[in-house]
């Protein structure tokens, strides 16, 4: 059984037992988090939401809060001696999918 959930402005296909990385959620490590925006549930019986499936939830356990690899953004304007260098690390949350309730 699998489901498609929406979190952080993205749609993610998940299965039970799968580990996923999502945009940072405001929860502590070890807590459980429930996704209510389930767009699709597949498996033996298929349920398609319009826009979400009524009563369907996906429960996950928070494994880790972290930050991704650093990217460097460098901008400049030619012949003007104007340049700027910035770094960015995107925060994320690592989850393990426990149960898909449909």
From Swiss-Prot:
Subunit field text: Part of the 50S ribosomal subunit. Contacts protein L20.
Origin species: Staphylococcus aureus (strain NCTC 8325 / PS 47)
Single biological process term from Gene Ontology: translation
Basic residues bias spans: 80-91
Family that this chain belongs to: Belongs to the bacterial ribosomal protein bL21 family.
GO CC, any one term: ribosome
GO molecular function, one term: structural constituent of ribosome
Region (Disordered): 80-102
Function noted in UniProt: This protein binds to 23S rRNA in the presence of protein L20.
Keywords annotated in UniProt: Ribonucleoprotein, Ribosomal protein, RNA-binding, rRNA-binding
Protein name per Swiss-Prot or TrEMBL: Large ribosomal subunit protein bL21
Top-level taxon of origin: Bacteria
One of the Pfam families matching this protein, by short name: Ribosomal_L21p
Cross-referenced HAMAP family: Ribosomal_bL21
